[in-house]
């Protein structure tokens, strides 16, 4: 009796093992490669860019609301440290949110590194694209001198008062200036928006590229047109 019970248990266990093995090989069962990845495990550049960047910077790195990632001058003047800081921490007061997990975003440090490397590999331009360009960042600038820089280099498209001209829109619109940082303005002045017909720092007036001081001054002039933040109500 005891031996018969042992044989029965062994047979049941064997059958169970066969059934389990059979379930693993059922037609249509997803393979490991078919299983969805956790968001933090995604390492494909195209996927990361498409899900996190394309909405503002364009599906192909251009023609979005924000600066084009395929702009060779932009990629030449911004270093990896600065790009990582912008992606990780965002730009307070603008539409650029933080993407790093410690800052409230969803991306790991590794994923941010993949984005930086992928942007450079996918859209790298000529090595000398930014040769002679003013530095990516700078403080200061004189808005009074910037008035003259604007008149000589910008008003032909944006109008004498910056409110728009025959070929381009306003650069002093309160809503626009409230949504962009001084660094963004500086980047546009230096790198341009070629997909929109906006020249870079050396292409507006032939043979007369803007100096670093002139870039800082015209940015200061633009920033002076930004409305002051509204005061909070006391009651």
What kind of region is each of these model predictions?
Residues 2-13:
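Bacterial N-terminal signal peptides that target proteins for export
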Residues 19-22:
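C-terminal motif of bacterial Sec signal peptides marking the signal peptidase cleavage site
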Residues 24-47, 121-149, 232-235:
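Electrostatic cytochrome c docking/interface patches
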Residues 35, 39-42, 46, 58-88, ...:
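Gly/Gly-Pro-rich "capping" loops immediately C-terminal to redox-active cysteine motifs
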Residues 39-43, 47-50, 77, 105-109, ...:
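Short, solvent-exposed loop/helix junctions and linker helices
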Residues 45, 49-59, 115, 146-160, ...:
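The canonical Cys-X-X-Cys-His
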Residues 64-72, 89-122, 129-140, 165-170, ...:
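Axial heme c-ligation environment in periplasmic c-type cytochrome domains
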């Amino acid at each position: 009796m005891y031996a018969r019970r042992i044989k029965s248990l062994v047979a049941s266990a064997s059958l169970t093992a066969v059934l389990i093995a059979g379930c693993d090989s059922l037609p249509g069962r997803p393979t490991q490669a078919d299983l969805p990845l956790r968001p933090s495990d995604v390492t494909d550049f195209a996927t990361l860019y498409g899900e996190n960047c394309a909405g503002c910077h364009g599906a192909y790195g251009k023609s979005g609301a924000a600066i084009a990632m395929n702009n060779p001058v932009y990629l030449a003047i911004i270093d990896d440290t600065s790009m990582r800081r912008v992606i990780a921490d965002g730009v307070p007061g603008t539409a650029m949110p933080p993407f790093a997990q410690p800052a409230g975003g969803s991306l790991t440090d590794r994923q941010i590194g993949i984005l930086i490397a992928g942007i450079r590999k996918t859209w790298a331009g000529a090595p000398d694209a930014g040769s002679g360009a003013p530095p990516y960042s700078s403080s200061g600038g004189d808005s009074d001198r910037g008035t003259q820089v604007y008149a000589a280099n910008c008003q032909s498209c944006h109008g004498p008062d910056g409110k728009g001209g025959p070929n381009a829109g306003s650069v002093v619109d309160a809503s626009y200036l409230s949504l962009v940082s001084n660094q963004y303005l500086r980047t546009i002045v230096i790198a341009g928006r070629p997909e929109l017909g906006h020249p870079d720092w050396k292409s507006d007036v032939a043979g007369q590229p803007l100096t670093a001081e002139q870039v800082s001054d015209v940015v200061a002039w633009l920033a002076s047109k930004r409305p002051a933040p509204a005061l909070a109500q006391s009651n």
